[in-house]
Amino acid sequence: LEPEFSVTWRLIAKTGATCRSTLEMLIDDRTKHTDTFDVVFIALGVNDAVRLRSKRTFLRRHQAVRAILRAQFSATSIVVPGVPPLGGFPALTGLMRWVLGAHAKRLDQALSSALSKETQTAYLSFDLPLTADAMAEDGYHPNAQSYVVLGERGGSGISTLVRQI
């Protein structure tokens, strides 16, 4: 994004985070910080899919996360990558791969549809290759190079939204 934009950033990440745990953390965090954000990049969904959260619950909680970011942290724009296609993860096999893959796809389609109705929100499809050479050793997480690609795509989505403001 630099040098076109002045960038300061804050990373909030937690292994196993779900929409619910993120919402709880944001509610708690808002009393501790007075930060405001022009753009927020929210990567949630994998852990909700693995826990087989219903579409309705997932969408409601994801929307609540976006709402608190806008209301309490003044987020003008929100960029959301899609729910990764768990059915392609090398670490998952057999029935687990099929069930989680189908569920993640349903959540992703519902999220894409919901976000298409919001202004100043961008959905980025998750279309990275899920080959062994693009994944970390655990076969579940992207490797460093894949995160670079995700970051570049996120930056492009942010740049597009900011230009629309």
Where are each of the predicted segments found?
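A short helix->loop->beta-strand "cap" motif at the edges of active sites that frequently abuts
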Residues: 73-77
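Conserved SGNH/GDSL esterase-like catalytic core that processes O-acyl groups on lipids
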Residues: 1-64
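Alpha/beta-hydrolase-fold catalytic nucleophile elbow
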Residues: 43, 81-82
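Generic structural signal for well-ordered alpha-helices
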Residues: 62-67, 108
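Alpha-helix N-cap and loop-to-helix initiation/capping positions
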Residues: 53-61, 95-103, 138, 142-146
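Short "lid" loop at the C-terminus of a central beta-strand within the Rossmann-like core
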Residues: 46-47, 84-87
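Histidine-centered active-site loop/cap adjacent to the catalytic His
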Residues: 137-165
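Substrate-gating cap/lid alpha-helix
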Residues: 88-125
